[in-house]
Amino acid sequence: MTQAILQLSEIEKAFPGVKALDKASLNVYPGRVMALMGENGAGKSTLMKVLTGIYHMDAGSIQYQGQPAAFKGPRDSQEAGISIIHQELNLIPELTIAENIFLGREFTGSMGRIQWSKMYAEADRLLQRLNVKHSSKTLLGDLSLGEQQMVEIAKALSFESKVIIMDEPTDALTDTETESLFKVINELREQGCGIVYISHRLKEIFEICDDITVLRDGKFIGECRVADTDEDGLIEMMVGRKLEEQYPRIDVKHGETCLEVVGLTGSGVHDVSFTLKRGEILGISGLMGAGRTELMKVIYGALPSEHGVINLDNKTINPVSPQDGLANGIAYISEDRKGDGLVLGLSVKENMSLCALDKLTKGVQIQHGEEVIAVEDFIKLFNIKTPTRDQIIGNLSGGNQQKVAIAKGLMTKPKVLILDEPTRGVDVGAKKEIYQLINKFKADGMSIILVSSEMPEVLGMSDRILVMHEGRITGEFDAKDADQEKLLACAVGKKINEEAA
């Protein structure tokens, strides 16, 4: 194999109470795509932060283009030709696309004036390369999350980088946007660029990557060619054991109807009706922009409804705020856990109990003893990997943050639990744990709505499935009668109704 353009060797990094990296290594080769795999908490993000100078390593070495390297920070590594596209976007909604791409390095003339036309033309060229249909004069805030991700990628391309690190780049992308990204990755590969591709989507790894490096518990487990392994072998390397059934669905006798929605119309939702029983998992499928999240937010009270009826336990409710939703007994776990779900600067305990303070308060006093017992119970039940309950949640891995977000909803003791993309950005091992928790809630008689863009997840975990297109329900199926082909047909607007009688 060619000489590596970038080598991270036996990197060590410790934080109070946890050794994040324990002799972790990574090689990046020119003209090849290296997948960096591992469960949440395996050390992938920490390794990238050591590389780009955000963290200082305790031991180990970095070689870049055959020379020892130590970067002072992301700007330093970027100027050297190493760009990183983070999972959390680093963009400003109030600026145009072009201003975001060239922020801090605007094109200027001899008098120091910004050469706007030249800057917009170059930004438009980058957008065209990524098949983004917007003018670079468009405000970033007017773009969808997926389109904003493409702007972040355009920004990395503008540096003419020799190494590009992509952290979950397709998480918020549509299938079409993912295809455009893969075309660009192939172009970069042909130009000799070395790419690090971090993703939990195994299908993508086998489609776009050449090599795989696996980390587990901060340790280097191995490097192999994609052609020399398969999904089962890769999962075993990542989790250290074989995963049996991927979707552990259980059969539970359903109780009475808990939630009934009739003719609901609101923000992005048109004339939606459905029911949900106790002990039932109702899957909601559809393409990006179909209105799934909007429907959940209208039911929860985070978006306004125009007309229609929501009945909970045979009583009509009219939630006009998330507080109403919680008070009614509806918990909504957002798809955007870092934007809507969690306060990253607060501790695990504070995040978990934030929405349940009324249940932990007597008079005006928070019952801290009860709070600690409840939080510790959830940490144990959910197998949340944290040194203590007082750990700042921003320091936890994505999978553990997601478990805290779900626990936060359950602390309110809801009748209906809405899970919007509960396993997005979560590794295969943590996914299995989340599925097992969902089954536990189901067995306890809780009513669950599972919104997911992953059709196998909806098919594997749901009892019944609704499909949405342009804010309307275009299909309803019993899980045993559904398959990906039927769901996709409904997702693009073809009406089917095959619910079992």
Swiss-Prot record:
Its EC number is 7.5.2.7. Residues 6-242, 253-495 form the ABC transporter domain. It catalyses: D-ribose(out) + ATP + H2O = D-ribose(in) + ADP + phosphate + H(+). One of its GO terms (molecular function) is ATP hydrolysis activity. It is a peripheral membrane protein. One of its GO terms (cellular component) is plasma membrane. ATP binds at residues 38-45. It is found in: Cell inner membrane. It comes from the Bacteria. Its main location: membrane. Keywords: ATP-binding, Cell inner membrane, Cell membrane, Membrane, Nucleotide-binding, Repeat, Sugar transport, Translocase, Transport. Belongs to the ABC transporter superfamily. Ribose importer (TC 3.A.1.2.1) family. Part of the ABC transporter complex RbsABC involved in ribose import. Responsible for energy coupling to the transport system. The complex is composed of an ATP-binding protein (RbsA), two transmembrane proteins (RbsC) and a solute-binding protein (RbsB). This is Ribose import ATP-binding protein RbsA. The lineage of its organism: Bacteria, Pseudomonadati, Pseudomonadota, Gammaproteobacteria, Vibrionales. The gene is rbsA.
